[in-house]
C-alpha cells in the first residue's frame, strides 16, 4: 500500500509534468508552424495575450485608414476619376492627368488651376495667362536662373579682370600704331605709280633692307613725286654729298640759257627744247630730261619735280624731299608729265656718243690745252 501510495503519488506528478510538457511543446510548435493562437496560464501567456491584443489593434487602425483613403479620386467637381491605377503623383495629389493641365477647373466651388510646381490648386489671379505655374514660383525660378552666383562672379573677375586691360592696351596700341603709320605714309587715293615701284609701310622701309631702293619710295600728290615724311629724308640725306643749296640747283636747271660751267656752252646749244643735265659716274652717263622748267617751289612739293641721283662718288640731290632711283647706263627718266613714269632709254647709245663728244670739247680748250678728267 505504501509502495503503491508512494509510487502512485511519485508517479502521478512525474507523469503529469511529462504530459504537460509534451502537450505544451507540441502546441507551441504547432502554433509556430500553423499560425495558431497559443494561450499560456503563466506570465508568458499574459505577454502572449497582450502581444496578440496589440496586433489586433494595429489591424483595426490600419483597416480604418485603408478604408478612408483606399480609393483615391480626382477632387475636381464633376470628375471623380479613380486614380488607383494612375501614377503616384496623381494619386497623391488627387488630380487626374487631364485636369492637372486644364486652365480652369472648379474645386470646392472655386475656379482654380493646378500649379505644377506647387502641386496644388491656386486661384486664377495667381497665374499669368497660359503659364502652368503660379507667378510666385516663376519669379523665384527666373531669379535663380538669371542671377549668377557670387562665387562665379568672383571667379570671372579674378580670371578675366587681368586679361581684359592687357588686351585693351595691346589693341589700342595696335590701332594707334596703324593710324600713325597711315598718317606718315600718305598713300595716293586716285592715281598710282608704275607697278615696279613697291610701296611699303614706314615701319619696314626699303632702304633698311636695300639702300639702293631709297629712290623707289614715293607717293603721288598734286602731280609730283615726294616723300611723305621729311624726317625720314633728313636722316637719309645726312650722308649725302653734293649740292647743298637746292634753290641754286633748281635755278641752274630752270634756266635754259645759263651754262652749268664754263665748258658746257655746246651742251646748252644742242638742247634748246629740253633742259638736259648730265653727270658722269663710274657706271656711265646718266641723263635727266626736263620737258618744262619747274615753277617756283612750294614748301614740300613740286609740280614737275627734278630727280635725285646717287652715284658712287658724287651725290646730286637738287631737291631734298624729291627723289627717284634709276638704273645707271641703260635707263632714262623723263619728268615731262605729272606722273613721273619710268621710261626705258631707247637712245642710250646716242646719248653716250654725244656725251663723249662733249667730254672731248671740254678736255681740250682753244686757249689752254689742259686735260679735264671727269669724276
Swiss-Prot record:
<dbReference type="InterPro" id="IPR004333">
    <property type="entry name" value="SBP_dom"/>
</dbReference>
<keyword id="KW-0862">Zinc</keyword>
<feature type="zinc finger region" description="SBP-type">
    <location>
        <begin position="71"/>
        <end position="148"/>
    </location>
</feature>
<dbReference type="GO" id="GO:0006355">
    <property type="term" value="P:regulation of DNA-templated transcription"/>
</dbReference>
<dbReference type="GO" id="GO:0008270">
    <property type="term" value="F:zinc ion binding"/>
</dbReference>
<feature type="binding site">
    <location>
        <position position="118"/>
    </location>
    <ligand>
        <name>Zn(2+) 2</name>
    </ligand>
</feature>
<dbReference type="GO" id="GO:0003700">
    <property type="term" value="F:DNA-binding transcription factor activity"/>
</dbReference>
<feature type="binding site">
    <location>
        <position position="74"/>
    </location>
    <ligand>
        <name>Zn(2+) 1</name>
    </ligand>
</feature>
<feature type="region of interest" description="Disordered">
    <location>
        <begin position="252"/>
        <end position="278"/>
    </location>
</feature>
<feature type="compositionally biased region" description="Polar residues">
    <location>
        <begin position="363"/>
        <end position="375"/>
    </location>
</feature>
<feature type="compositionally biased region" description="Low complexity">
    <location>
        <begin position="262"/>
        <end position="275"/>
    </location>
</feature>
<keyword id="KW-0479">Metal-binding</keyword>
<keyword id="KW-0804">Transcription</keyword>
<keyword id="KW-0539">Nucleus</keyword>
<feature type="binding site">
    <location>
        <position position="99"/>
    </location>
    <ligand>
        <name>Zn(2+) 1</name>
    </ligand>
</feature>
<dbReference type="InterPro" id="IPR044817">
    <property type="entry name" value="SBP-like"/>
</dbReference>
<dbReference type="GO" id="GO:0003677">
    <property type="term" value="F:DNA binding"/>
</dbReference>
<dbReference type="GO" id="GO:0048366">
    <property type="term" value="P:leaf development"/>
</dbReference>
<dbReference type="GO" id="GO:0005737">
    <property type="term" value="C:cytoplasm"/>
</dbReference>
<dbReference type="Pfam" id="PF03110">
    <property type="entry name" value="SBP"/>
</dbReference>
<keyword id="KW-0963">Cytoplasm</keyword>
<feature type="binding site">
    <location>
        <position position="96"/>
    </location>
    <ligand>
        <name>Zn(2+) 1</name>
    </ligand>
</feature>
<keyword id="KW-0805">Transcription regulation</keyword>
<feature type="region of interest" description="Disordered">
    <location>
        <begin position="345"/>
        <end position="375"/>
    </location>
</feature>
<keyword id="KW-0863">Zinc-finger</keyword>
<feature type="region of interest" description="Disordered">
    <location>
        <begin position="43"/>
        <end position="73"/>
    </location>
</feature>
<dbReference type="InterPro" id="IPR036893">
    <property type="entry name" value="SBP_sf"/>
</dbReference>
<feature type="binding site">
    <location>
        <position position="134"/>
    </location>
    <ligand>
        <name>Zn(2+) 2</name>
    </ligand>
</feature>
<dbReference type="GO" id="GO:0005634">
    <property type="term" value="C:nucleus"/>
</dbReference>
<feature type="compositionally biased region" description="Basic and acidic residues">
    <location>
        <begin position="345"/>
        <end position="362"/>
    </location>
</feature>
<feature type="compositionally biased region" description="Low complexity">
    <location>
        <begin position="18"/>
        <end position="30"/>
    </location>
</feature>
<dbReference type="GO" id="GO:0048653">
    <property type="term" value="P:anther development"/>
</dbReference>
<keyword id="KW-0238">DNA-binding</keyword>
<protein>
    <recommendedName>
        <fullName>Squamosa promoter-binding-like protein 9</fullName>
    </recommendedName>
</protein>
<feature type="binding site">
    <location>
        <position position="115"/>
    </location>
    <ligand>
        <name>Zn(2+) 2</name>
    </ligand>
</feature>
<feature type="short sequence motif" description="Bipartite nuclear localization signal">
    <location>
        <begin position="131"/>
        <end position="147"/>
    </location>
</feature>
<dbReference type="GO" id="GO:2000025">
    <property type="term" value="P:regulation of leaf formation"/>
</dbReference>
<comment type="function">
    <text>Trans-acting factor that binds specifically to the consensus nucleotide sequence 5'-TNCGTACAA-3'.</text>
</comment>
<feature type="binding site">
    <location>
        <position position="122"/>
    </location>
    <ligand>
        <name>Zn(2+) 2</name>
    </ligand>
</feature>
<feature type="binding site">
    <location>
        <position position="79"/>
    </location>
    <ligand>
        <name>Zn(2+) 1</name>
    </ligand>
</feature>
<feature type="region of interest" description="Disordered">
    <location>
        <begin position="1"/>
        <end position="30"/>
    </location>
</feature>
